[in-house]
Each structure stands twice: as structure tokens, then as C-alpha cells.
From Swiss-Prot:
One of its GO terms (molecular function) is ribosomal large subunit binding. This is Ribosome-recycling factor. Belongs to the RRF family. NCBIfam families: frr (TIGR00496). The gene is frr. It holds the Pfam family RRF. It is found in: Cytoplasm.
Length: 185
């Protein structure tokens, strides 16, 4: 029973960490990353379709993304979707390829993005701590129902705390990597 609670807590903490990584990967650094365009939706015959389903996105160099559209008739729609996104990008098309140059980030914008990364990280830590709280409540319920002893409860709560500490440390590592990436020119 306790092992199931620990396993569930670990799985939920891993999901929280993955969600944090997903949120942080969308924050633009000065470097070209294909994942930057993941959130863009293109109007494809009246339906909003993810760009990834309509085109291949690769980093051409450190400051340019190349978007190769599978269907020539969609080039204008893809270009418009990139232009109207809130990423501040200005695409230009050449044949079936759309080049998206990334403007360099200003120092002030880097600081703003760093604050955003820290806020996302704090939300990630809160999510991990909420998982810990839920697991501890389940363990206390087992003690109350006399399914486990107090010693087993203490041991289980210590294990959950160690798990929480390790995931908070992983969140800090992800944040440090992203902040370093943001501040590198």
C-alpha cells in the first residue's frame, strides 16, 4: 500500500517536472530552436492545425529557423501564422522554404524572460510539494485506519520528503540551465 503511494507520488512528480520543461522550452532564448514554433496553429481548410503537422522545422543556423512546408498552397497561411504569433518573428519565404530569422534579445528582455523562468520554476516546485502533501495525507489516512504503524508512517513520510527534495533539486537544475542559456550572448 505504501509502495503504491510512493510510486504514484514519483510518477506525478515526474509529470510535474516534464510539464515545467515543456513550459520553459517555449520561452525564447537568442538561439534558434525548432520547438519555438511548436505552439503555432495554422488555419488549414478552416481548422486550426499545429505547424508540425504541416511543415518540417529545423534550425538552419544559430539565429535562423527553416520551415519547409509540405503543401505549397499553405506557404502564405504558415507565414501568416508565424507573423501573427506573439513571438515577434518576421518570416520570409523562398520557394517551399520559409526562413525565420530570430532577432537578438535585448538585455532588458533577457532579464524579463529570466523572471518568467523563475516564476515557472516556482510553479513547478509548488506542484511537486502538492504531490508530497497528497501522498502524506494518504499515508496519514492509512495510519488512522490502523493499516500501518506510526513507525511505518514516519518512514514513508521521510521517503516522500527525500523524493520531494530530489525533484525540487531537479527543478532547480532545469531553471539554472535555462537561465544560463538566456544570459549567454
Amino acid at each position: 500500500m505504501i509502495n503504491e503511494i510512493k510510486k504514484d507520488a514519483q510518477d506525478r512528480m515526474e509529470k510535474s517536472l516534464e510539464a515545467l520543461k515543456g513550459h520553459i522550452s517555449k520561452i525564447r532564448t537568442g538561439r534558434a530552436q525548432p520547438s519555438l514554433l511548436d505552439a503555432i496553429q495554422v488555419d488549414y481548410y478552416g481548422a486550426a492545425t499545429p505547424l508540425r503537422q504541416l511543415a518540417n522545422v529545423v534550425a538552419e543556423d544559430a539565429r535562423t529557423l527553416a520551415v519547409t512546408v509540405f503543401d505549397r498552397s499553405l506557404i502564405q497561411a504558415v507565414e501568416k501564422a508565424i507573423l501573427t504569433s506573439d513571438l515577434g518573428l518576421n518570416p520570409s519565404s523562398a520557394g517551399t522554404t520559409i526562413r525565420v530569422p530570430l532577432p537578438p534579445l535585448t538585455e532588458e528582455r533577457r532579464r524579463d524572460l529570466t523572471k518568467l523562468v523563475k516564476a515557472e520554476g516556482e510553479q513547478g516546485k509548488v506542484a511537486v510539494r502538492n504531490v508530497r502533501r497528497d501522498a502524506n495525507e494518504k499515508i496519514k489516512a492509512l495510519l488512522k485506519d490502523k493499516e500501518i504503524s506510526e513507525n511505518e508512517q514516519r518512514k514513508a513520510e521521510d521517503d516522500i520528503q527525500k523524493l520531494t527534495d530530489s525533484f525540487v533539486k531537479k527543478v532547480d537544475e532545469v531553471l539554472a540551465d535555462k537561465e544560463k542559456e538566456l544570459m549567454d550572448f
